[in-house]
Swiss-Prot record:
Chain segments carrying region Disordered: 269-289, 332-360
Protein name, UniProt field: Viral protein TPX
Lineage: Viruses, Adnaviria, Zilligvirae, Taleaviricota, Tokiviricetes
Positions of Thr-Pro(N) repeats: 270-291, 302-322, 333-353
Ranges of biased composition (kind: Pro residues): 275-289, 335-351
Sequence repeat coordinates: 292-301, 323-332
Annotated organism of origin: Thermoproteus tenax virus 1 (strain KRA1)
Stretches for region 3 Thr-Pro repeats regions and two near identical repeats: 278-353
Keyword Transmembrane helix recorded: no
Keywords: Repeat
Amino acid sequence: MSYQITINNNTTSNVQNIVIADPNLASLGENVVFSDSQGPLSSLYVYDGVWVVKLRSPLSPGQSITITASSGTPNIDPTIALYYNNGSSYSNLTLVGSPTVSIVQDFGGYAISAYASGDFFLVASPTGFTPSSSRLLVVDRWATTPTSLDAVGLRLYADTNDWFGVVRKYINGAQNVSIEQKISGTYSVVNEIDISQFAAFTDPLVMYLSINGSTANVKVYKQGSNIGTVSGNYSTTPYGNPSMAGYGTVDKHYANFIVLPYEPDPQVTVTPISSPSPTPTPTPTPTPTPTYDITYVVFDVTPSPTPTPTLTSTPTPTPTPTYDITYVIFDVTPSPTPTPTPTPTPTPTPTPTSTTSSNI
């Protein structure tokens, strides 16, 4: 099974690293090879149906390219989502496709964050970069697993050299989420959002951070539904060591962030990912019912023979014979009454006469 994916760069920038999210790819599992006309491309598995694919060369504005996704041995490049390509800047990860799956993946302790510049998503390592983002979408792997711990955090780190702010999720008996922000080296609770509507925390939470001047707006989403917004100031003071060293074992867990595409790029388009069209099964042609051209009918008192159809079809039922009655003669002469034979009268038997004699 293979899928054809056509990418159209309708932007004004070059794009090379593409996030392809489509449930059709989930049927291929992790063993997916992406290829262009010259052969396999480098890729990075994110989650079922979601991959980061590095094009062989940047796709210029107005250009299109068709790649193929099929079962096979992938050409995994673990640096795609971690390091920049040209040594001076990070390549944009342009989201294409139809992201309908929740992306939750542990990258083995690597600290991965994402930010958007314009309509592009960027994935980078925490080795230091200057953010210019207004949007940030990440999700923590633990957010999908119920736990007995009091704090099972989700943090967004931010400053000019490292990350954008600090957000932490607390779970307590009241089922509240505490949004915390790193300000001047200390934590301060900006607001609390009641998430009692969440079902046992088995669904991932998405923290959406918007930077506007000195205000950080944090929105919490569950399956795309906004349940609240908090605001507060953020600090541009570098937070900790950009290499994440010394953060402690718990904070290393917090570094297991991945991209959760929420706002598809409206400018870079992709054709629907689909398999080749199957050959349609021909519909059998029905056998036509034979028709007859009747030019004349001869009526005779002899039953008509059954016509033999000229085409092979359902046999025509034998018609009931018809007769042409030409005339009927009625004889009005009464039939003679037969003369009855007279019954002979029986001759009566004579009564015998007795003679009496007397002797005096």
